[in-house]
């Protein structure tokens, strides 16, 4: 049995290893929850044996040493971290400790904030001008990232307003919105660059670039949450008051900051934020709860590495560790072959996860994944679980290599990978049952032809029994044939036939989307329909003409052109029309004849709208003569920004494009 000294040494060594990977290499190997567990275990042992605490124990400091590639900045006021609580009982115990230590009848109010999952930074302003910025580093010394921070548009280079202190050190979090993270990884996959595991790693990697020009291209943003140095001026005597003052001076502060009058209100805030978490547009891993009164903060003071007046109330972990039992390969509607990890089931963020996507062969190679490996699984909101990284330090001896198939696992056709593309595809086309099933499921889906009651299991049976080969065959189905399927009685069968009949009346845009042309999503389908107006015009369009449609480049134009050039596709379309699929004749809109503030303008919608759906907004804008595009470019005239707008808003601001909010859009639509 190990001695206490041996246990302490092993825990400290393990924690230092993971601190180095997290803070210095920006390549964490274990989830935050596992690190927290190890730290709690060490702290509990040291509490029982205080005589064995060493000055260099991970419990006695904040982070890790800075990179040698950057010059260093010493923090005049140490940047401490926060203690954590993980459940209501622990928070209520913290609340009681605060009340007991204050020993007065004076009421305690709490300033509650989001715990952003980014990189903590310190920004020093002298006479209102940004002069330096640093990472937290080890809490006393950080890396000089001034040049990089100056590229972040959310951070003012000069404060504005009155009574700005002579020296003011603002502390906050640099982070990457989810839309920006997805765009960075999408670009990286296309160009063969580094793919980041999560937005926090992407933010850290972006901020710690030696070349600020690279940082400038990344849509980083910032919220401030505190103050370090304060000289030659005064600030309000409450934490919330200080944040509101920062906002007046031009510093970004989260609009989710809330003042709570009691522990019960704090818990309500925690649960509300947890509920809203999937729609925020950026990653958080909990809430931060601070005593609002500065006088009470001073009275409570600090322990070695954290304040007694604040705590981080963390959400259930979105990352967990488990083992890869096997890797299987699925075939999608376009023939894309996707490797899927079959996992030892594990609960992640309240959901039992047994599968995780591995995307493609490049991703498997990047991860260095082998069957049998211990891996970190991440699940955020409704996102499909994914493997974040392999825990190489705990790799079993009997792992096996993942072998990518050379033939389709469903139909046996050759698998090909086009040069420059990450995805491998089955060449079987509609002779491949998997592709046929997925194509039909897409065709009947809600945003495509919207065939009510035609679920995945019905499609599976229709293909397996060879009742249906193409989308046109769906409209030839009879109630009698459908009753031959499992769990399909006469009434249900007739309902499906009625739904198919109803689905024949559609729109040109929905029809195009339902066809499943590669790279043609809803927005592109709507753009093609609006630009060409008729199926005949679209079928006859050249690649050059197709590229005149907003957001259609050479790749998408080629896919569309090739689709209509294929005789079998044209035959299916002819059959669909013969079965009665139709849509209204196009209304030709001449933007010059429309008296509208949107007429002739290229408009981009970003963020979520609260008063109307995006589809309704797009339709209304098109009616008023606008061209609705899916991405921001120099050709964009106007951006409409809803809640949680991300990288599109940032790019619009960078290009100096006019931006309005939903309220102004509704006003203009009404005018």
From Swiss-Prot:
> Which Enzyme Commission numbers does its entry carry?
6.5.1.2
Q: Its family?
A: Belongs to the NAD-dependent DNA ligase family. LigA subfamily.
- Positions binding Zn(2+) in this chain are 408, 411, 426, 432
BRCT domain ranges (all copies): 593-671
Which residues of this protein are catalytic?
A: 115
Note the SMART domains from the entry. Answer: BRCT, HhH1, LIGANc
Known catalytic reactions: NAD(+) + (deoxyribonucleotide)n-3'-hydroxyl + 5'-phospho-(deoxyribonucleotide)m = (deoxyribonucleotide)n+m + AMP + beta-nicotinamide D-nucleotide
Q: Which cofactor does it need?
A: Mg(2+); Mn(2+)
Q: A single GO CC term, please?
A: cytosol
Report a single Gene Ontology molecular function.
Answer: DNA ligase (NAD+) activity
What CDD domains is this protein classified in? BRCT_DNA_ligase_like, LIGANc
Name of the protein in question: DNA ligase
